[in-house]
Amino acid sequence: MEISKYKAVLALVMLQFTSAGVALFTKAAFMEGLNPTVFVVYRQAIATLFICPISFISAWRKENKPSLGVRGFWWVALTAVIGVTVNQNAYFKGIDLSSSSMACAMTNLIPAVTFIISIIVGFESIKRRSMKSVAKVIGTGVCVGGAMAMTFLRGPKLLNALLNQDNTAWLLGCFFLLISTFAWSLWLILQVPIASHCPDHLYTSACTCFIATIASFLVALALGNTHLPPWKLDSFLKLSCCIYSGFQLAISFFLQAWIVSQKGPVFSALFNPLSAVIVTFFGALYLKEQTYLGSLLGALAIILGLYIVLWGKSEDYQEESTDLKLENEHNTSSQSDIVSIMIGDKAFRSSELLEPLLM
């Protein structure tokens, strides 16, 4: 078989390895003294410097220049504050206080939390007689139960049992990771109004990164990082961690956008547990992170719940894709397919995703 058929799979596997690398890299840098809040500023700034020139060149080559408008700008600003600034600060503070394996396991809660928020805001409805709708509810419950087990039912130590860890710091770290999960889910929800104001995904992402950099810098100052010492990258590990994480953030955007355009959002989410497995193994091996029976069982429950939710979501995506195909058959003026990105039962479309994002 041609290897081109497996490009999306290879890209997703690579993305999971790079994401796992960020979790492990940052935990090691935090153990050496890197401030998580300062790290977020550096990461966002590097990602912005990478994305903005590409966005400018892409917009310059188009006949219809992208524009957000006043309302679109406020939606992007809200996304930058909640979905990026709050999300990343909470996520990396959670890694600092708990472990990188816990952080990666918690990210598997995102589809379930997004499902809950989608119901609240009206993007999703529960069909009692639909098996897949019931599956989404059951999967969400399993995910929540797994998260509670990871947080409170730690159980006996399986790896690195001789090391001690502060229980209060662990619980606080889990709390920050849950905040990050909700902020991440809100970021997904907010893509709907943003796309309705400006369908240029690259342009809106560049704007989001730029605003998030400013917001993250203000948060860092507000938390007391007003002197030079916290901002010094006085070791190779700290410097390389910031550079690697910044480029990974920028590159992951291109990979995710391309994968969604090829295979859809459900396919992309199926690979999320891979990073948790990678981080758990290497975290215990190199960072001496403690592994608990309760945490391991909770992580397995979250992964099980994730796949149950995704099985239920697959019907929504398939139905929407079928409707779009029928619509495109009757639309003779359109020469390209339209990709639907599902958020709940509703979708927003972006033909921009069909542009060659990976060269």
From Swiss-Prot:
Ranges that cross the membrane: 10-30, 37-57, 66-86, 103-123, 133-153, 170-190, 204-224, 240-260, 266-286, 292-312
InterPro entries in the record: EamA_dom, WAT1-related
Entry GO terms, CC: membrane
One term of GO molecular function: transmembrane transporter activity
Keywords assigned by UniProt, alphabetized: Membrane, Repeat, Transmembrane, Transmembrane helix
Domain EamA: 18-131, 199-310
Location relative to the cell: Membrane
Pfam entry (one): EamA
UniProt membrane topology term: Multi-pass membrane protein
Homology family: Belongs to the drug/metabolite transporter (DMT) superfamily. Plant drug/metabolite exporter (P-DME) (TC 2.A.7.4) family.
Name of the protein: WAT1-related protein At4g28040
Organism: Arabidopsis thaliana (Mouse-ear cress)
